[in-house]
């Protein structure tokens, strides 16, 4: 697979089912995802032929499994799913990357509202450090999430081989 741009919905489809289940579980617990959760409820309701109100009565695990089985989602929903996954399950990797960049963070979350764009040499070193320490698909998913969230700050990641998902 080339390192051409990957949209969030495509990345979601490429994620293994077990990771999609983890992402969906984190997503349902994410208090900042109300808009995307409404979209997810409608998708699940259509898929299992339930009323949306009935979907909300399903347990978290069932909703997560149903959502993980939906491969055709919007970019907005897919991006939130991937971000929720990282916030819940990938904090050590996020922190390691920010440490390598010398960016202040709290458990993998950048403290500064407007982070400074890292210079090329620092970014190169941090990318290599992370790629050597974590599985390639995990690093690629994280870098794509950074690019979607803040392309101005993380634009230096574009075109790198570490973005390749396969």
Model-derived regions, located:
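Acidic, low-complexity, intrinsically disordered interaction modules
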Residues: 33-150
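Short, solvent-exposed coil/turn linker segments
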Residues: 2, 7-11, 54, 72, ...
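Charged, amphipathic alpha-helical stretches
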Residues: 2-33
């Amino acid at each position: 697979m080339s390192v051409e741009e990957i949209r969030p919905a495509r990345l979601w489809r490429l994620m293994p089912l077990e990771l999609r289940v983890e992402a969906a579980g984190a997503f349902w617990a994410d208090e900042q995802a109300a808009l995307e959760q409404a979209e997810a409820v409608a998708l699940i309701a259509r898929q299992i032929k339930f009323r949306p109100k009935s979907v909300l009565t399903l347990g978290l695990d069932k909703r997560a499994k149903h959502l993980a089985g939906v491969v055709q989602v919007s970019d907005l929903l897919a991006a939130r799913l991937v971000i929720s996954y990282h916030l819940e399950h990938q904090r050590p990797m996020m922190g390691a990357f920010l440490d390598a960049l010398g960016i202040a963070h709290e458990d993998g979350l950048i403290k500064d509202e407007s982070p400074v764009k890292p210079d090329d040499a620092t970014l190169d070193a941090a990318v290599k450090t992370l790629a050597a320490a974590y599985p390639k698909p995990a690093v690629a998913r994280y870098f794509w999430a950074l690019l979607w969230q803040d392309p101005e700050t993380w634009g230096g990641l574009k075109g790198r081989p570490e973005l390749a998902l396969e």
